């Protein structure tokens, strides 16, 4: 998926995550994370966001995530929503997304 504009999903409420996805001219994926649970789960959150981007076939994006203790399913859902908004895609391929769950 090609990121065309900046988009945001989520909130700064407890147990949520606010994620901002923007185009990246460097043609790489960069993830910046601000989390209250950085020491315990920072690497896991980054890996989950990165894997979700890979599953969506995103090859270049700047991602800024502010985590307030979100569960994995919330992190994944917010990432999916932000990427679709940033790519200008209105339709979700639910079969493809569901196939990620093994």
Swiss-Prot record:
The keyword Lipoprotein does not apply. It comes from Streptococcus pyogenes serotype M4 (strain MGAS10750). Belongs to the CitD family. InterPro entries: CitD, Mal_deCO2ase/Cit_lyase_ACP. Oligomer with a subunit composition of (alpha,beta,gamma)6. GO terms for cellular component: cytoplasm. It is found in: Cytoplasm. This is Citrate lyase acyl carrier protein. The modification O-(phosphoribosyl dephospho-coenzyme A)serine is found at residue 14. Keywords: Cytoplasm, Phosphoprotein. Its main location: cytoplasm. Covalent carrier of the coenzyme of citrate lyase. Pfam families: ACP.
């Amino acid at each position: 998926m090609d990121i065309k504009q900046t988009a945001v999903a989520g909130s700064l409420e407890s147990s949520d995550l606010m994620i901002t996805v923007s185009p990246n001219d460097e043609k790489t994926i960069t993830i910046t994370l601000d989390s209250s649970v950085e020491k315990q789960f920072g690497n896991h959150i980054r890996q989950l966001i990165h894997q979700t981007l890979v599953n969506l076939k995103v090859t270049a994006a700047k991602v800024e995530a502010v985590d307030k203790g979100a569960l994995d399913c919330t992190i994944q859902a917010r990432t999916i929503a932000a990427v679709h908004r940033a790519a200008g895609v209105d339709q979700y391929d639910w079969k493809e997304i569901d196939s990620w769950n093994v």
